[in-house]
Amino acid sequence: MPEYRSKTSTHGRNMAGARALWRATGMKDGDFHKPIIAIANSFTQFVPGHVHLKDLGQLVAREIERVGGVAKEFDTIAVDDGIAMGHDGMLYSLPSREIIADSVEYMVNAHCADALVCISNCDKITPGMLMAALRLNIPTVFVSGGPMEAGKTKLADHNLDLIDAMVIAADDSASDEKVAEFERSACPTCGSCSGMFTANSMNCLTEALGLSLPGNGTVVATHADREQLFLRAGRVAVELCHRWYGGEDPTALPRGIATFEAFENAMTLDIAMGGSTNTILHLLAAAQEGEVPFGMRDIDRLSKRVPQLCKVAPNTPKYHIEDVHRAGGIMSILGELARGGLLHTNAATVHTRTLADAIAQWDVTQVDDDKVHTFYKAGPAGIPTQIAFSQATRWDTLDTDRSEGCIRDVAHAFSQEGGLAVLYGNIARDGCVVKTAGVDESIHVFEGNARVYESQDSAVKGILADEVKAGDVVVIRYEGPKGGPGMQEMLYPTSYLKSKGLGKHCALLTDGRFSGGTSGLSIGHASPEAAAGGAIGLVRNGDKILIDIPKRSIDLLVSDEELAARRTEQDAKGWKPVEVRPRKVTTALKAYALLATSADKGAVRDKAMLDG
């Protein structure tokens, strides 16, 4: 049987010094024979999705110790993409994912922890911790801080989220008073932003990967039911320790759970619920860390056969994450996918032997269990707060309408084509991604003239100055992992296109990425990126670009001979932006750029550069 990793520092005469230090943290004689379980928290007062996490690590710690483990908590960093957006702060967002993964690895390996509880929530924190978990491959369970409640105002006929505040602010016809009302109403509570944006998408995907508990992605942060998720996560961490160190059960480890089949399940869910395109980036990165051969071609294959069963903001103003929970949460979406023959239901989870067992226990349309039904009735209270577990409001009824409700069955899907697609062509040889759930069907095939910008800042200025016209394809390049560096999100350009009335009349193509709040014909992750010699760096103003989502293609309508000539010219000039960009690229960012791969590889470090 495997020995506790912690035995390295807790046993033997030569470890007297280490034990003395452990004792100084509060450990007693009897603790040195127990598993030491690390709790990676991510509390910060900078991020609404993390502002309520301060005491939750200790909540988990007490439960771990109650059931026989030793708990030791530490914190990672957390960047708020919304606050960092629109200025040089966004250069740090994606690189922070690697820092988070490294920090978890450093703490866990330096102290020889036996298991891990990841308390995450927002955009780069869940992916960073997921990457670390798959690197470390020790018993791990995820529990998130939960989604924010949707905002409410008398000035709108639908609930609000962050994107509504951004779009109205860019609308010149909106009064200052209306903008202020939206701003004050859009983000009423602690938690990750209330739509199917990156944070919530990733927290939902951990359920499909099998690494978190039912409800992890959908119980609002303010609800008392989420406290039980934290307590149960502590108990599960100890159970996983017993299964691995006491029984050498490989399905107690992340790599035994998050297999190729589990990654296919997670991507299938992502496509079915129209999740953020960033999830593709993060799943690819996590797969690389876990040595799982899951890539863009697999995503492309899945996108052609998985229907869209759930439609949530920003793809529709009608539903937010709180509505997904009322409809049965992720387990109900997985249930519909399973009945459609679209899942590997034999995949393991941290809480059941198989995913099939989990669905059988938690799918509200199949289970006649009052406790399960009551759990999924947990709803918002509509009271602004930054306090976790501060309310116990419940919906009167569940939404189990699978023909016209928030979650549909396969026969009544919102679309038989899923919510995400991978496009290939001469402008993106290694692929690019589009959130089809947010694209109006009238522009699924689009041909337009290129309007080229060498930075997000220039594109924003151009859009606001009315340089972009209906029928244009806005091209924003040198914003990839290397070129940015840091692969900025392009939420401001897409929001401003909407505010100018061009949301259904233009396309946007970039080697950068998009916020989970983006909708419209927004195509990101163009690979290879311009800074790596990608063809997006060869586009010139006025070039015709043809986008065909049904055919999964995107092409620059320029002859091969002309492209070859342009490439020769660009090789001589160097693959860098023509304009001088007023951004400060620090040593830390340069170090990230030096090793970063393009988006089709998850923008992870190029290990060949390190190994070679």
From Swiss-Prot:
Homodimer. This is Dihydroxy-acid dehydratase. The gene is ilvD. One of its GO terms (cellular component) is cytosol. Its cofactor is [2Fe-2S] cluster; Mg(2+). It comes from Xanthomonas campestris pv. campestris (strain B100). Mg(2+) binds at D81, D123, K124, E489. PROSITE patterns: ILVD_EDD_1, ILVD_EDD_2. It catalyses: (2R)-2,3-dihydroxy-3-methylbutanoate = 3-methyl-2-oxobutanoate + H2O; (2R,3R)-2,3-dihydroxy-3-methylpentanoate = (S)-3-methyl-2-oxopentanoate + H2O. Binds 1 [2Fe-2S] cluster per subunit. This cluster acts as a Lewis acid cofactor.
